[in-house]
Amino acid sequence: MELVMKDAQGALTVSETTFGRDFNEALVHQVVVAYAAGARQGTRAQKTRAEVSGSGKKPWRQKGTGRARSGSIKSPIWRSGGVSFAAKPQDHSQKVNKKMYRGALKSILSELVRQDRLIVVEKFSVEAPKTKLLAQKLKDMALEDVLIVTAEVDENLYLAARNLYKVDVRDAATIDPVSLIAFDKVVMTADAVKQVEEMLA
């Protein structure tokens, strides 16, 4: 199949298996959820009644005071007491096979092509690391919410994009399922397309 180049004459020939496969919603959902879960810190921690600092002595005798019976100042009912079912640090990561991960990326890329959300260009760069230059370039292309993917890390482009809302710059080796579906449009250079194709082959 062929992808039309926006800034040059002609088209780029690409693999049908990478950019023309059916959309597998269940697979994409599973991989996206797993990827997002892997980004969780999982470091939150609370103390149970066994871990809270304080005396183990019964606050007052069982009967005769007129007050409600109480056996510990560490009770979850009490202020500064322990937490019932306290949260503990945990690993939220989920296992995703390489074949599944690659399949999800291919599925997403194919859907981007079908929805005309993937824009292929010969090259994409700015002369200097100036936000103003990139903002004007995107305005000329009628792009706002966009992920820019280049073959190699372009420092000028990266620095220029840092202060732009809903604009991100990645090199082909660091694309991920969440980023690809998070933006309205994805701009990829021809070299990046070839690199992604080789990576997912």
Swiss-Prot record:
Function of this protein?
One of the primary rRNA binding proteins, this protein initially binds near the 5'-end of the 23S rRNA. It is important during the early stages of 50S assembly. It makes multiple contacts with different domains of the 23S rRNA in the assembled 50S subunit and ribosome. Forms part of the polypeptide exit tunnel.
Q: Which GO terms describe its biological process?
A: translation
Is Phosphoprotein among the key words of this record?
Answer: no
This protein's GO cellular component annotations are: ribonucleoprotein complex; ribosome
Does Ion transport count among this protein's keywords? no
- What does the sequence similarity comment in the record state about its family? Belongs to the universal ribosomal protein uL4 family.
Its quaternary organisation is: Part of the 50S ribosomal subunit.
Underlying gene: rplD
The name under which this protein is listed is: Large ribosomal subunit protein uL4
Q: Where is this region: Disordered?
A: 44-71
GO terms, molecular function: rRNA binding; structural constituent of ribosome
In terms of SUPFAM superfamilies, this protein maps to: Ribosomal protein L4
- Origin organism lineage: Bacteria, Pseudomonadati, Pseudomonadota, Gammaproteobacteria, Enterobacterales
Keywords for this protein: Ribonucleoprotein, Ribosomal protein, RNA-binding, rRNA-binding
